[in-house]
From Swiss-Prot:
It comes from the Bacteria. InterPro entries: DNA_mismatch_repair_MutS_C, DNA_mismatch_repair_MutS_core, DNA_mismatch_repair_MutS_sf, MSSS, MutS, MutS2, P-loop_NTPase, Smr_dom. Its EC number is 3.1.-.-, 3.6.4.-. ATP binds at residues 330-337. It comes from Lactococcus lactis subsp. cremoris (strain MG1363). This is Endonuclease MutS2. Pfam families: MSSS, MutS_V, Smr. The keyword ATP-binding applies. PANTHER family: OS10G0509000 PROTEIN, OS10G0509000 PROTEIN-RELATED. PROSITE patterns: DNA_MISMATCH_REPAIR_2, SMR. Residues 701-776 form the Smr domain. Belongs to the DNA mismatch repair MutS family. MutS2 subfamily. GO terms for molecular function: ATP binding; ATP hydrolysis activity; ATP-dependent DNA damage sensor activity; endonuclease activity; mismatched DNA binding; ribosomal large subunit binding; rRNA binding. Keywords: ATP-binding, DNA-binding, Endonuclease, Hydrolase, Nuclease, Nucleotide-binding, RNA-binding, rRNA-binding.
């Protein structure tokens, strides 16, 4: 895309609005290098990343990123084996740690899938092994004492020498206060000295390191600490040498990973940029438009991003594929230029993968290039008039624009004789229309109103003007040509009625009729716009309610799953405890050679007491299951409490069954035995299930005519049924239409773990209107 349009539409100023949300140097670099794209798949991926991040944040909170600086020069020097400073090692550490934190955040994220972001995350290299090597630095870039054993010993010696020197110096300071100019110990040439009055220099034996500017004070190192200071300086030299050695070894260990560190830095920067887009999206009530190749520009509540949010006026702009040209007529200062810039700028932002200031449902066609003649671009150096300057620009546009270009003209034909200017404007627009070039033009020439009415694929538009307040509203009115309000405005400003009346007589009857017709059109348009706004308001409220309900539903599901898991664990603990106690009781029984009847009854009661007393009488699921057990007289059962087979004799009044086990007859509750199914029952049940599943599942599902949510639910159910029926291949008919249902189907198939592969149907079987899937 040509650079001139980026300057005209102030593209870089909009990019600056994202800069404050970025925390990494790499993210800022990616923003600076950003230009509009024309590859639909690449742009869609950028939008999908933001959509993924939005879902991730809604479920798991905002990802926090620390500030990082540019590693380009640091890594270049690392690869050249040049020495690095402690602060530079810390910068490397920050990037590595940030990569680890990001990976951990995504790994621990719940209730959301981020397939688009995963493409970036999968490229992140795990460098956690290097973090331990870099933990020897504090945040300022200084080495900790335990960076090496040698460094620890050296610094311990330094502290010992410093302490000893400080003690001696403090004693000398106290003893020689009268000889000192100040009651302090100071530093000269890295050695501790005393500020001695010049006349008392012979009272303190030592080495003079400095003199005050006045010559009244000498800075003397007492002989008592000279030797210790020498030792201290030697240890400091050893400390520097050890630090250099540690730096060198660490650099050698990091060098093989320089490529991975550099790649991680850029990947982190990209995630930072995605995060910045999300923050812009939410802070500005922006949206991610649908991308099209059908020449649709549909913008709902479009706003110019460089106008104050409190002042900007939102406009619906429907420049669909049925239209080739929009002609905005009417007086100046009504917002025509801003409308042109808004369309161009939002298109460029969308093609850059950035959110746009428009409501959901907006659609943007991808253009190869955008051209504009907006504002007074005359060149003083070339001594061109305003008209010549514009015409020079227009000539270049006509030479370069094609059917996949968007052209914007502001005050087309201005700067010359009105009749000739209008004629030129019509001819230029007609040339572009015949070449199928999408064009928006503003003009104040009334002749272009007739062109907009009489010409196919061309529509008039105007900017609304509030007569009562005598000021423009900046609302775009599609289908309504602009009209002059000069007479009415003059009347309200106090111009004598006689003058207004005489002026009105100068206007032809046909022109007067046209103005009345336009006025009625404006009223109807206002009514339609107001009705449309109310409908959109209700839609937004419904969408908000749907989001809230979905969030509550997901929360309930999470809490339910948590409670089920908790109950399951508790049940397992109860069973485990009961099992251990039962084993202990059985062991005690086995230890006794002979048992008396009352001991057997007591032991059995003890076993029964291990089971928790839960009332299942109101449980519908258990009732249904019990009814399906088919308990009847003569049925074979397995008595679980005795581990023996038996036969049901009769059902007693208390709900228990009399069961015969060999020669023993006893009464048991239904929970104490299980019905043993005969081979015939098992075979009949299997046939039943097989017949029930396979008889109802077809190999084709037709989603045409369904709403998105309805189609999505129908597809989920159908795949489950197809899997139960052991189908190998299925066909989903979704039609071509807008492509929304088709994209939903393919995303579902891509994510489903039981789908082996999928592709569009052959041409003779529906082509891109149907998808064939192979089941695993």
């Amino acid at each position: 895309m040509n650079k001139k349009i980026l300057q005209i539409l102030e593209y870089d100023k909009v990019k600056e609005q994202f800069m404050n949300a970025l925390t990494t140097a790499q993210g800022q670099k990616e923003l600076s290098d950003l230009v509009p794209l024309t590859d639909k798949d690449k742009i869609q991926l950028l939008f999908d990343e933001v959509a993924d991040f939005r879902l991730l944040t809604q479920e798991n909170g905002l990802l926090n990123l620390g500030k990082t600086n540019d590693l380009t020069e640091i890594l270049r020097r690392l690869e050249l084996e040049a020495s690095l400073s402690g602060k530079e090692f810390v910068e490397i550490k920050k990037v590595i740690q940030l990569g680890i934190n990001i990976q951990r955040f995504f790994d621990e994220a719940e209730n959301v899938e981020t397939p688009s972001l995963n493409i970036t995350l999968e490229k992140l290299v795990d460098l956690s092994g290097l973090i331990k090597k870099l933990e020897i630095f504090d945040n300022a870039g200084s080495l900790y004492d335990n960076a090496s054993l040698e460094l620890m010993h050296i610094r311990a010696s330094i502290k010992s020498h410093q302490s000893e020197i400080r003690k001696i110096m403090q004693e000398m300071l106290t003893k020689n206060l009268s000889s000192l100019s100040e009651n302090v110990i100071t530093i000269r040439n890295d050695r501790q000295v005393l500020p001695v009055k010049a006349e008392n220099k012979n009272k303190i034996a030592g080495v003079v390191h400095d003199m005050s500017a006045s010559g009244q004070t000498l800075y003397i190192e007492p002989n008592a600490v000279v030797s210790l200071n020498n030792k201290l300086n030697q240890k400091r030299i050893e400390e520097r040498q050890e630090i250099t050695r540690i730096y060198r070894e660490l650099a050698e260990e990091l060098k093989p990973y320089s490529f991975d560190i550099r790649q991680n830095a850029w990947l982190i920067g990209h995630i930072d940029f995605v995060r910045a887009k999300y923050l812009y999206l939410t802070a500005n009530k922006a949206s991610l438009p649908a991308l099209t190749n059908d020449k649709d520009i549909i913008l709902f509540a479009a706003r110019h991003p460089l106008i104050d949010a409190k002042m900007v006026v939102a406009n619906d702009i429907k420049f669909d594929k049925t239209l080739n040209t929009i002609v905005i007529t009417g007086p100046n200062t009504g917002g025509k230029t801003i409308t042109l810039k808004t369309v161009g700028l939002l298109t460029i932002l969308a093609q850059s993968g950035l959110p746009i200031l428009a409501e959901d449902g907006s659609r943007i066609h991808l253009f190869d290039d955008i051209f504009a003649d907006i504002g007074d671009e005359q060149s003083i150096e070339q001594s061109l008039s305003t008209f010549s300057s514009h015409m020079t620009n227009i000539v270049q546009i006509l030479a370069q624009a094609d059917e996949n270009s968007l052209v914007l003209f502001d005050e087309l034909g201005a700067g010359t004789d009105p009749k000739e200017g209008a004629a030129l404007a019509i001819a230029i627009l007609e040339n572009l229309r015949k070449r199928n070039v999408k064009t928006m033009a503003s003009t104040h020439y009334p002749e272009l109103k007739a062109y907009g009415v009489e010409t196919q694929q061309v529509i008039n538009a105007s900017m609304e003007f509030n007569i009562d307040k005598m000021q423009p509203t900046y609302h775009l009115q599609l289908g309504v040509p602009g009209r002059s309000n000069a007479l009415e405005i003059s009347r309200r400003l106090g111009l004598p009625e006689t003058i207004i009346s005489e002026a009105g007589q100068q206007i032809s009857e046909s022109e007067h009729d046209v103005n009345q017709m336009i006025e009625k059109l404006e009223e109807k348009t206002r009514e339609v716009i107001e009705s449309s706004r109310n409908i959109k308001k209700i839609e937004r409220e419904n969408q908000s309610l749907h989001k809230d309900l979905t969030k509550v539903y997901n929360q309930i599901n999470r809490e339910r799953d948590f409670e089920l898991e908790k109950a399951q664990k508790e049940a397992q603990e109860v069973v485990k405890k009961a099992s251990l106690e039962a084993q202990e009781i059985l062991k005690n029984l086995n230890d006794k050679a002979a048992l008396k009847p009352h001991e057997i009854i007591a032991a059995r009661k003890e076993l029964e007491g291990l089971a928790p007393t839960i009332d299942f009488s109101k449980n519908k699921v258990l009732k249904k299951a019990k009814a399906q057990r088919g308990l009847k007289q003569g049925a074979e059962v397995n008595v679980t409490s005795y581990g023996q087979r038996g036969k049901l004799i009769r059902l007693e009044k208390d709900g228990r069954w009399t069961v015969q086990m060999g020669s023993i007859t006893t009464r048991l509750s239904e929970e104490e035995f299980e019905v043993i199914e005969t081979p015939e029952q098992i075979q009949a049940k299997t046939k039943n299930v097989s017949k029930k599943v396979t008889s109802k599942v077809k190999a084709q599902l037709d989603l045409r005519g369904m709403r998105y949510e309805e189609a999505e639910l129908e597809l989920d159910n159908y795949i489950d049924q197809a899997l139960l029926a052991n189908l190998i291949q299925i066909t989903i008919v979704h039609g071509i239409g807008t492509g929304v249902i088709r994209e939903m189907v393919q995303k579902k198939l891509q994510k489903h773990r039981h789908i082996k592969s999928y592709e569009y149907a052959p041409i003779n079987a529906g082509g891109s209107g149907a998808t064939i899937a192979i089941l695993k």
